[in-house]
Amino acid sequence: MKKAGIFIIVICFISNLFAIDGLLSKSENLRIVKTQYFDIIFPEECRESAKILVENADKAYEELAATYEQPMLFRFPVVITPEEQMFNAYFSTGYYNRIVMYATTPDEDFNEFSEIFLSTFKHELTHAFTFNLRDKFWQVYSIMFGDNPTPTMIAITSGMAEGATVSYESKDGEGRINNEYTKHLLRQAKIEDDFPSYADVSCVAEKDPNANFYEFNGFFHDWLQKNYGMKKYGEWWYRQVNIQSLTVGGAFKKVYGFKLKDAWNQFAQEFEIPEICDDSVENGKIQDLFTPDSNVYSKENSSGNYFYFLTNTQKGIYFYKRGYIYFIDKNDLENSEIQAKKICSVSNVSNIRFSNDGNFAVITYYDLNAPTTKRKISIYDIQNKKNIRINKDAIKDGNLIKKDGEYYLVYTDFSSFNVKIKVDKVDFSNKKNFLTNVSEKVLNTEVNAYSYVDVGGGNFAFINKSKMNYSICVFDSECNLVKEYSLPLEKMDIRYLSFMNDNLYFSWANPGTMIRFGKVDLTNDIISLSNQNISGGIFYPVGLNQNEIAYIANFAKEYRLLKKQIQPETMQEFSVETIAMNNDDFSNEERTLPLELEGEREYKKYEHLKRGVLLPLGTVVSNSFGENGSSQIDLPIGISYITSNPWGGTAFYGSVGYGQGTNSVGINLGVQGGSDNTFFRYVIDNVTEFDKKGWKSASLALGLSSEISVLKKSAFAISNNSYGFIGKENNVNAKNSFGAYAPLTNDKYLYLENSTSFVYRWQESTGYSRYAKKGFAVGPSFLYQYLSKVTPVKKEYLNASRLGMQGLIMIPRLLPIKCKTGLTYNLPTTIRLNVLSPSATNYSIDSPGLVFGFFKDSAAFELASFEAQTVLFSSEIQKSIFGTSGLYLNYWTISFVYFGEFECFPEKNRSSYSITNIPYFVDLVKQNDVFYNDCAAVRFAFAFTPAIGGLANPANKIEMYLDLSLANVGTELLPQLKFGIKMN
């Protein structure tokens, strides 16, 4: 009884320690308000966001149910967290229905909403509603066993799921369906005659732009609803959710009476594109920025690249591509061939701006070295090649302005409840007090500021979005409004502001247009708007001179850097009034949090742990270790339960299972959790087993892991796994029958194992190909194992340790050639090396197994192994082979693989080795006691993804391969034909 009490205290301590982690790692004093359908959980600093949901969530649910003509069946928690600094939200059924909202300032990607937080909630609520369109059977199942597993896991693709959300979010005139920047992706695909099939946008594609399943499915589902009504659409969902048809296409045909493929083709045919002018590189009206004299695209513009953050400065043009900032000197812009210079590498980038003089890059990036994602800013001194990190988070979209020869940093600060525009004076010589705040302005509710640019004289301009209304504002360094330019056309959406020679440049669109170019003459207060629709659109326009711009064109499968002469007849001028007074969108006084909400109370940490997943089977495993070896035997007859807090930080699980083979009962209790990313994760797992003689065994496992980003493209990963067992040994040599595996004696054994690994890795992309990566990983690993009999007589069987080293090198190409998009033939190579890899004893939890299976001598000791794989040829497929369902083919590859291994037969009384024992192994070599076995193979492989239900995701990719190999084992050459499967 005393032991049981201690165990309960330990479990309570652990659960209390990790009760608030993950997405609420720093939040205390959680509050809850229960509405008719939702439990809204939030920390005090999110009370304003909570107020929005308390007032609107129930109504949003009722409207959604009325739209689908379905009853309201569920109630679940909604968590609001301020910890995640990248605006988003998600719905999950694990381990019960729940929505988590990130209460932070949004980026331009959410410009399609006037009430961004509420609209994002409605998007996730649509997921919750459609995923829970259950019939009576699944409703009873949910009551008995919980919300997960759910039939949607095998029935609904991500494409279908997002089709419902994107179409619903747009039903009232906002949302992505009504946004021209979103439409651009579909329009451009149709312009290029490259419109995908339905299966191609089911979320199985690996290549960029890999998020297009949102857009294509959203417009398709909107088309279905408008042409055939919501009743049929709801029936399609109902049928698919309840698995009344095996495939999405089968359910569609039952409801609509014709094939999904035919509906998709009709939708593609009817999708309208605006009239496009004939300007192109081919006819010389547009120029390739890298080869302006050529009528064909340059290598840079035809290699599947994606360019961002194009900026013109007094020194020249900067842009970002594949992890690097590049520069083109202004004196080189008229050359017939232009080579961009690589400036520096950057990672986890959110935004990059450049000072007008071209001396500094201001980088907004995501910091992953924290329990949740943080947004930070660094300033890169281009001339001195020095990166200066600002030591605070919750800041973004920074840029430098210059006044009287001194620099000021302007940025958005969302570190508190109030979102502010801030201006700080920069002192590069003072490392301790690098920034000094000089002014700030509070943004009022539903107001967002983007694209800060220096316009000279200590003033800066930015795009101001208030609900769905845009304007261009000019502030001075004291955050006083100097001018505000209203836009001349209705429903204009503007982005990507830049400045050159007293002119502001921007991208714009309004209903029915492609993405066009606009300009503001700050001297004469004239706005000029392009009246042309150009294939690829005009993104990130920058002025080269008064009549020429450079820009990024977004084509269907790559972006291109182009430039174009601006003809006066293609521009329409508007004289606009400017306002030089305080705007209601901004305030000098901070807003206050709302008072305590009606029904608000303190949230109890364990309030939702009673909700979870109940499984009518045991997940307990009977482990045993002894002089005859180790065993793992399932105890499947039983019951299991798993739950977590509503924000998914900590999961608790328990299982009771019985196995007829061991005639024993096991109890498994565990907890796992940590940060919301790879910064820190843990698992604690306990198994206690009983048989007819009473207590049989107990084990405890503890796993810890952490990955910390260092420098720019590298990371340091640490993991430690400890395991302890004490108890009786199963009869491991028995044949499976009732009680056959039960221990033959009452002898008890103690087994201990600890494995530790440290890995430093560096990697960067060198091209568009999946194999175009260079980098390395290296690190030591240590394994300790101990086994002894503890009763009735103590006897040691194993006391072994091994310290080894692993390494990996990725070479992007052996041939100095660039491959065409979608093909690989420049021989990328990966090399792996293991020296005294600590994983070879029979008692290791993770026994490795060799690559080709030739080397089978269990007495042999692996000193080192070497593997090299060279891709001879690879081709991307990225297409479905069965139309609307079936398999999605990713790629096929032919490669050459070589594997070699050094083995020895060490003295029997030696059980511990490390890389410090090199002299001992040298002696073995001298005595010819080291043997080398190797194998070479040609591997034919192709990868596919099941395009069915929740399996339709690149994470579920399967690679099938066939090896034609020849092995040298001792003095024999052994041919082998081997078929294998690898999964992500």
Annotated model-derived regions:
Residues 22-23, 29-32, 211, 235-358, ...:
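Beta/coil-rich, acidic/histidine-enriched accessory regions frequently appended to metallopeptidases
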Residues 25, 94-96, 109, 113-120, ...:
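Acidic/His/Gly-enriched intrinsically disordered linker/tail segments
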Residues 277-305, 329-350, 379-402, 424-451, ...:
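Multi-bladed beta-propeller domains
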Residues 280, 294, 508, 560, ...:
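Outer-membrane beta-barrel initiation region
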Residues 512, 537-539, 556-558, 678-747, ...:
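Outer-membrane beta-barrel translocator/channel fold
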Residues 733-899, 904-932, 936, 971-973, ...:
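C-terminal outer-membrane beta-barrel translocator/porin domains of Gram-negative envelope proteins
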